[in-house]
A protein has these predicted regions:
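Cofactor-binding beta-sheet edge motifs in enzyme active sites
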Residues: 4-166
């Protein structure tokens, strides 16, 4: 079973609920496969992240707790980059001189739960630092499309599409 099928199974993808919207995306880099499903609900017509499922095939996992923490962090970073982060430049240098002018995701905007599971195999360990961020962006965009009916092509979504997480 491929990781995309596994994450869809774990997230109960085929269950249809009119108030719950799910998006899926998969990615491969550094010899690691990652698939993400995000679950979004609308609260006063604004999206709220409920739960994220993530399947990872990165070979032998030496430190499962540390690996899970890395994946969770990259998912939250991916959500933050997709929704809020934008580097602005003027005359060849960054407008942002400190973090007070650069938007980050807030704790209240993070998913209520992230479930990470690893494919168990005997393959040599591979990369784990980057692979979960890109599919988090894609899964979020797909879930927001299902929730709002609008495709999101430009980041940050909050600026270009006037969507903000509650």
């Amino acid at each position: 079973m491929c990781i995309r099928d596994r994450v869809k199974e774990k997230s109960d993808w085929d269950t249809n609920a009119s108030t719950v919207h799910k998006g899926v995306a998969a990615y491969f880099c550094h010899s690691t496969y990652v698939a993400v499903v995000m679950e979004v609900i609308l609260k006063k017509n604004q999206p709220k992240l409920k739960k994220v499922w993530c399947a990872v095939d990165c070979g032998i996992v030496i430190n499962k707790e540390g690996a899970t923490n890395m994946i969770e962090g990259r998912i939250i970073d991916g959500i933050g980059h997709a929704m809020y982060s934008e580097l602005k430049f003027e005359n060849g240098s960054s407008v942002h001189k400190n973090f007070d002018t650069y938007d980050f995701i807030r704790h209240r905007q993070s998913p209520s739960e992230i479930e990470v599971f690893f494919v168990e195999n005997e393959i040599t360990p591979t990369g784990l630092g980057e692979p979960a961020l890109p599919p988090a962006v894609g899964a979020l965009a797909n879930a927001l499309y299902k929730a709002t009916g609008s495709r999101l092509y430009h980041q940050p979504f909050s600026k270009h599409h006037e969507i903000s997480l509650v």
